[in-house]
Amino acid sequence: MNYFPWLTIIVVFPISAGSLMLFLPYRGNKVNKWYTICICILELLITTYAFCYNFKMDDPLIQLSEDYKWINFLDFYWRLGIDGLSIGTILLTGFITTLATLAAFPVTRDSRLFHFLMLAMYSGQIGSFSSRDLLLFFIMWELELIPVYLLLSMWGGKKRLYSATKFILYTAGSSIFLLIGVLGISLYGSNEPTLNLELLANQSYPVTLEIILYIGFLIAFAVKSPLIPLHTWLPDTHGEAHYSTCMLLAGILLKMGAYGLVRINMELLPHAHSLFSPWLMVVGTIQIIYAASTSPGQRNLKKRIAYSSVSHMGFIIIGIASITDPGLNGAILQIISHGFIGAALFFLAGTSYDRIRLVSLDEMGGMAISIPKIFTMFTILSMASLALPGMSGFVAEFIVFFGIITSQKYLLMAKIFIIVVMAIGMILTPIYLLSMSRQMFYGYKLINVQNFSFFDSGPRELFLSISSLLPIIGMGIYPDFVLSLASNKVESILSNYFYG
């Protein structure tokens, strides 16, 4: 056990420091913004330091573990720990949240509350990724929903209340299934009930019970991921939310669902996962085609990017369903890769909206000359989203492809069919992404916007865009940096639960 509580500090620090902002005298919006950014940078530095000096990449077991008795009456523990599966998502959370706080500089209305909610969301997400106790995981999962709902309902477009209500109905409704699953999995067995994930991973269940528990967890994680047909909250939410909130949603929140599928469904319920994986493969394949074919019909810029997120999540689901070393590694790389790509695209869409106050693609056009820096960055990131070689998306999707080919679970004809359908989806992806760029930046100039010659990207926006782009190129050139973090954990999961 690690005796210095690194993870407790990392989880508690953002929400604690953010709470001070609410109680200290109001010093103006600028002070609140820089205070929040300093907290995020300090948190990211602490996280990086703790992981660099304490995390051993060749060890698949839980590291930096903390285990404290919390509530004696309920036998409830504060258990935290990280492994190769969670370290990448925690670092991604820190990086994207820091960029999102910097992107939120234009927010002036109730900025104290806005930045506090971002920090509270930060703590909830880190807590979810580092929890080693099932009930603590559920609490952090729910803690993260409250700030998201308030961010959606208070800052955004005209229909923000509708989208926020739809979001909370979907996510809170699915959380009931998560809670039932948590209680069911912890209370089963002749021994005393346990919520410790490491003990639960070594426990076996009757097939019927395992299937019931698996379905409950799957519904909860399918809403967050999202999987079709439980995805309809996503386009509405992204279409109305402030773009800094969209960065957090696309970059981190969607990845929590995929993380839960691996951490709980795959690790704790291996037999049920083996039974359900063909269905997940079908859903993931349909999702790629469905989102890629539906996206061109979206006239709202942010909704079109949201559908591209749904399509990319299909590759993650297919990688998880392949039950192979390359497939699962590719899914984890895609989680990190799309976290950066999705957040960056929403940021650039938001900066464009700040200038022209339009989100309808039909009303845009001819902006390439007036805002060449934004045009260049948007084009490069669109290329990254459509998996251009040299970018992280290409490597992730290629590894997932390889995982399907090497899978021993599926017949050859089934694998060929899945690969062909995925290839069709990859052909459709450039169509809607490039048409989106064409509608925004080419063609005739806008006729409805006064004083068309608005300013281009400033230093803050350029820094944000480049900061998002560098990891995408870095992972595209040297993906082993991310893959090496999780490879031992992936081998451990597959050998212990499927091939052992």
Swiss-Prot record:
One of its GO terms (cellular component) is chloroplast thylakoid membrane. GO terms for molecular function: NADH dehydrogenase (ubiquinone) activity; ubiquinone binding. InterPro entries: NADH_Q_OxRdtase_chain4, NADH_Q_OxRdtase_chainM/4, NADH_UbQ_OxRdtase, ND/Mrp_TM. It is a multi-pass membrane protein. The chain crosses the membrane at residues 4-24, 35-55, 87-107, 113-130, 134-154, 167-187, 211-231, 242-262, 272-292, 305-325, 330-350, 386-406, 416-436, 462-482. Keywords: Chloroplast, Membrane, NAD, NADP, Plastid, Plastoquinone, Quinone, Thylakoid, Translocase, Transmembrane, Transmembrane helix. It catalyses: a plastoquinone + NADH + (n+1) H(+)(in) = a plastoquinol + NAD(+) + n H(+)(out); a plastoquinone + NADPH + (n+1) H(+)(in) = a plastoquinol + NADP(+) + n H(+)(out). It comes from the Eukaryota. Its main location: plastid. GO terms for biological process: ATP synthesis coupled electron transport; electron transport coupled proton transport. It is found in: Plastid, Chloroplast thylakoid membrane. Its EC number is 7.1.1.-. Pfam families: Proton_antipo_M. The keyword Membrane applies. HAMAP family: NDH1_NuoM. Belongs to the complex I subunit 4 family. PANTHER family: NAD(P)H-QUINONE OXIDOREDUCTASE CHAIN 4, CHLOROPLASTIC, NADH-UBIQUINONE OXIDOREDUCTASE CHAIN 4. This is NAD(P)H-quinone oxidoreductase chain 4, chloroplastic. It comes from Aethionema cordifolium (Lebanon stonecress). The lineage of its organism: Eukaryota, Viridiplantae, Streptophyta, Embryophyta, Tracheophyta.
